[in-house]
Amino acid sequence: MKIIGLTGSIATGKSTIAGWINELGIAIHDSDCAVHELLGPGGGAVEEVLAQFGCHFGTITGGINRKSLGDEVFSTPQKRLKLESIVHPMVRQHRDTFIAEQRRARAAAILLDVPLLFETGGDAMCDYVIVVLASARTTAKRALARPGMTEDKLSSILASQMPSDEKKARADLILDSDLPKDQTRNQLIDWLSVIGLSIVRNE
């Protein structure tokens, strides 16, 4: 089973690429979705996060107010690292369970969608890594359109991520989401075929 990693800085268009890959029949583990589940009502990280950061970050439904917590941790690197020390091991366990299930199902390939793939060492378990890029102007425009995003918060997030040039140097495939979507999608499909995956192209 081929393990493909997908990464890129915030708002580069990873979700679009992941959606295309999923449409092609490749199962995906989305680390952001895993985090949302862990911090949601009844999630596995809720109790420890509340113990470490305070009950005021809890919601009436039994989860974590991710926006308030995000505002808190991204303004203080030490707090961000503390949160990551709680959440990242749980995400890895979630991912490992997914991989084991896909191996048992004899999947030809899977995709690991991880914004901090290189930063967390997740690339070591991947056979291939796709890096998605976009211009600074494009990423800023997309990110600042998100609810609750500010320029200061965006700067803090970008500072916690590996620079794009370093990611490019470690990529097996680089996709530029500033290019026309059809061009990028065809580049992706061609590459998947090159690495030995049978892909049906829908024209």
Residue ranges and their predicted role:
Residues 36-108:
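ATP-dependent small-molecule kinase phosphotransfer cores
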Residues 3, 26-28, 108-109, 123, ...:
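Hydrophobic "anchor" residues on beta-strands that sit immediately upstream
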Residues 95, 124-125, 142-145, 149-196:
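Small-molecule kinase domains that catalyze NTP-dependent phosphoryl transfer to phosphate-bearing small molecules
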Residues 27, 33, 128, 172-173:
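Well-ordered beta-strand positions
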